[in-house]
Amino acid sequence: MLSAPVGEGHVAAARVLAARMRELWPAAEVREVEGTGGPGRDRLLRSSYAVTMRIAPRLYGLGYDLLVAHPRVAEFFKAVAAARLGRALAPLVADGPDLVVSTYPMTSGGLAWLRRRGRLPGRSVAVVTDVAVHPFWVWADVDQTWTLLPASRDQARAIAPAADVRVAPPAVDRRFRPGDRAAARAATGLAPDAFVVLVTGGSLGFGGLERVVDAVLAGGAQAVVLAGRNDRLRRRLEARGLPAERLVVHGWTDRVPELVTASDVVLTTAGGMIATEALAAGRPVLFATPVPGHGRAGAEMTAAAGLALVCPTRTDVTTTIRGLIRDPAGMARLAAAAVDFGVADLDAALRDLAAR
């Protein structure tokens, strides 16, 4: 089970899959590797992603758009990355595992490189953790590619027509499922009658979250903020001294499933794993000023599927929240669509994979 410590979504999905495998196949040996085969490379990937998204997100978006718009450019960089990752991963698969699953795009490329050279005899699966599929996610030499939506599958097939691409259930923790909002509010200390918006910018808390919080508050909602590992953001928000009925701030916490269940709406600037988790829990998702690249692309595709709303500006955030507060029927429609998305059976997909 391969992932990489770039953000938290890739690792979170890998841990869920590994846990499910151990439950389904107790006699199997399941190994988890949270890295790309080189500590230095992992540090570079992690730090460069974090710095770029905080300081120059538009630069990240330009790079993303370049790969999507110019397939030949993407294929060149894919070939370089796959060769480097393949050589680094070779020792990890030297004992011939029966199944290798990857939740990180470049790691999947390394597996494809090994397969082409006859050095990966077992089955391989690439699990796409974003709704939007950029070229590095899809490799024809990987046995299966799992995507989240039919539109994601179609996008992946357009990138690599020879790839076996399927729509698969989201790899999310079992705790993200429709639950008792009143009980969750009691457990988390939130008022039963408040309109609660859970605000997150991913594990790194990026996406201009402070100003997004202002927009949420202007809409008349209580903002419950997940600052993640961004301690500076947490301290700045706490320093405002607002009463808890207006603003609650959490740093890194293991209570995210409870907080999602307690919320009326989950608002994210980053998209990715938290949006998938919210949908699995039956909560409406609001993409607010989504970050360039995968955030913006994923937001548009999720909204097109009827699973979310997109607010390009902070003014849109305020207007949309006011509208949702006044429109319980619209909220119910979004929640019902989310529940339909989350009912797919991940265990069944894994059993089917093992039977092939």
In which residue ranges do the predicted regions lie?
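C-terminal alpha-helical cap of glycosyltransferases
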Residues: 340-356
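Catalytic binding pocket for nucleotide-activated donors in carbohydrate/polymer assembly enzymes
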Residues: 275, 279-321
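Donor-nucleotide binding loops and adjacent catalytic segments primarily
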Residues: 191-262
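A nucleotide-sugar donor-handling region in carbohydrate enzymes
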Residues: 143-196, 200-203, 228-232
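Acidic donor-binding loop of glycosyltransferase active sites
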Residues: 261-269
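Conserved donor-nucleotide binding/catalytic region of nucleotide-linked donor-dependent transferases
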Residues: 309, 321-339, 356
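Conserved N-terminal ligand/cofactor-binding loop architecture of enzyme catalytic domains
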Residues: 16, 20-92
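Active-site and donor-binding regions of nucleotide-sugar-utilizing enzymes
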Residues: 65-156, 167
